[in-house]
Amino acid sequence: MRLENTILRQLVTNEEFTRRALPFIKKEYFADHIERQVFSEIEAFLLKYNNLPSLESLVIDLNNKKGMSEDLFRGSVEAINKLFEPQETVNQDWLMEETENWCQSKAIYNSIMESINIYDGKSKEMDRGAIPKLLSDALAVSFDSKVGHDYVEDWEDRFDFYHKKEFKIPFDLEYMNKIT
């Protein structure tokens, strides 16, 4: 079983995982064109209806797509059917950790490949100056959504930090000892 299949399955069956992981997963991370198409359908449904999709809704939406090859359509329908087959439960913490590592790995891989194309002159949109930005964006992929302090929930840690006695290095000047 591939991690990509587990991620796609959890996106349609596990609401907590979907809410936490979907903002960080991009369709470019899926190498297989069928998995990429299935993810696009799942993502479109979730963004439009803010609810987990059903098997029927995904297949109908896929059927309404125009310009899709027959092989891609058949493969996508087969993959969607497999997503809804009963499976054993997956540990949530393990799943989040593995998904974060997978996203980081894919982001770095994609940025390195794009950097090689830029360096070789195959990219018309970007010049070589964009390579550091691509790589830094890829290295910044993280599921940690905490920014700064939460003044209500972190009050104990903040109180301890403010009242912690620090080891001080004594100065020869008494005035410097008072202000530090």
Which positions does each model-derived feature cover?
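The Walker A/P-loop phosphate-binding site
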Residues: 9, 141-180
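Noncatalytic partner-interaction/assembly domains of nucleic-acid and motor enzyme complexes
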Residues: 1-102
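Interdomain "pre-motor" coupling segment immediately N-terminal to P-loop NTPase/helicase cores
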Residues: 85-151
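Short amphipathic alpha-helical segments, especially helix-boundary/capping motifs
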Residues: 13-19, 34-36, 87-92, 107-109, ...
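Short coil/turn segments at secondary-structure boundaries
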Residues: 19-24, 54-58, 75, 94, ...
